[in-house]
Amino acid sequence: MAHQNQHQDTIDSTEVEVWDSRTAQEVNKSLYPPAVDSPFTLNTHLSAWRWACTIILGTVLVPVRVSCIVFLLILLWPVAVLSAINLPTQPTKPIRRWRKHLIKSALVFLFRLGFFFAGFLVKVKGKKATREEAPIFVSAPHSTFFDAIAVVVAGLPSVVSDSQLARVPLAGKCILVTQPVLVKREDPNSRKTTRNEILRRVKSKMKWPQILIFPEGLCTNRSCLVTFKLGAFSPGVPVQPVLLRYPNSLDTVTWTWNGFSGFQVCMLTLSQLFTRVEVEFMPVYIPSEEEKKDPILFANTVRIKMANALKLPVTDHSLEDCKLMISAGALQLPMEAGLVEFTKISQKLKLDWDNIHKHLDQYASFAVSSKGGKIGIEAFSRYLKLPISEPLRQLFSLFDRNQDGTIDFREYVIGLTVLCNPSNTEKILQMSFKLFDLDEDGYVTERELTTMLQAAFGVPDLDVSTLFQQMAGKDSDQVSYRTFRRFALKHPAYAKLFHSYIDLQAAYIYSLPREV
């Protein structure tokens, strides 16, 4: 890869370094090989020696650090309450300049002190851009809730956050101070609303705070950079990449859907002598005219820049892939290969997830009308209103388990239901049950239940007979929806899956990536 243009040498050292699109033309692909393992899993093995050290240090450090943090929270409470007075949850104009500087300076100091008490040693590289230079920060890789350090180091810019968090007593007040872009999970139009609000702010002549976005949309294990969502890139304005590194011999901070729990992450991290973290502000990237019109190209170029600086590969995994890991294990493919394959095929077909969401009920009607029968590629094409093409054949083959040229369209609809409604467990259960209640009498059989569970939740190798007897009783050969729902919501085997749905609803991707 060619080096950055030499004109940077003439820029005053106090200015923020800038990349424009011309200096990125040479970047066609990452310098590093593609990722193979799934970025959504974490298998950390602690040796006996590590466990012993952690327990000994934790016995001393955790009580001291927790006491210091609690004391700090007592100080933070009145500051946060006073700061949030008269601040609306959906601001229409920026807060006054004097108030912004006074409040944020106090909060930044207290938050930095809190991370210090928790044992974090923060190293900052590069120079933060001004709003005029870059209205948006994009930070990656996103691997833990401790990544909030980037928000603090950046001076508490606005963040994209769940509207529910604004109601949390202390955290909600602190979030309101940043004038966040709040996302309503229950609103099917949340993506469009969020995108429009970001666009309104960055294009406004008013002095809105800069916005910091984690474009990956979910936590990974930092082994690669997954597909970037397009919210930060759709406005077509300059962005400043912000890199996050945790150069520690033992990784205690990573929080993925099947790794350490949030409580375990906190306890393990507080039990370390210290935890290093590096926050690096990269040069501002100015998009070309082509990239302004094509946010996918813009996002991929920035992602490759960041990956090369981190010496990490990029991968076609996306947020939808992580949902598929939980919901579509029945694809009968090696997990990592199946995820990337689905993303690539979806990209080629230009699947519009907003449009799919609107047509779910229609798809369900088609599936129910088939009464459990198989459909071929022609009917599949007709249902999706897509021409028969090689990408469509590839998508079809993912669900054609025995390669006989037919699929059960109901399973495809259940998979789409999970992808489009990750936060609505009730909707998923209702749709699944409806599709397999062939005679519409409110009951399903053991065989139908087996297929439904595999398609809806990706739970392979279930002892279905035992499970069915637990749900229906020994003398019953069918299960009602009420019985199924009550069992599914209470059974421990499903609790983690439902919890994962809640964790993964943080955002959706606006589009799917091009290959790089």
Curated annotation (Swiss-Prot):
A motif (HXXXXD motif) lies at residues 142-147. It is a multi-pass membrane protein. The chain crosses the membrane at residues 44-64, 68-88, 102-122. InterPro entries: EF-hand-dom_pair (IPR011992), EF_Hand_1_Ca_BS (IPR018247), EF_hand_dom (IPR002048), LPCAT1-like (IPR045252), Plipid/glycerol_acylTrfase (IPR002123). SMART domains: EFh, PlsC. It comes from the Eukaryota. Residues 387-422, 424-459 form the EF-hand domain. Keywords: Acyltransferase, Calcium, Glycoprotein, Lipid biosynthesis, Lipid metabolism, Membrane, Metal-binding, Phospholipid biosynthesis, Phospholipid metabolism, Repeat, Transferase, Transmembrane, Transmembrane helix. PROSITE patterns: EF_HAND_1 (PS00018), EF_HAND_2 (PS50222). Its EC number is 2.3.1.-. Ca(2+) 1 binds at residues 400, 402, 404, 406, 411. It is found in: Membrane. Glycans are attached at residue 28. Pathway: Lipid metabolism; phospholipid metabolism. One of its GO terms (cellular component) is membrane. The HXXXXD motif is essential for acyltransferase activity. Probable acetyltransferase. PANTHER family: LYSOPHOSPHATIDYLCHOLINE ACYLTRANSFERASE 2B, PHOSPHOLIPID ACYLTRANSFERASE. This is Lysophosphatidylcholine acyltransferase 2B. The gene is Lpcat2b.
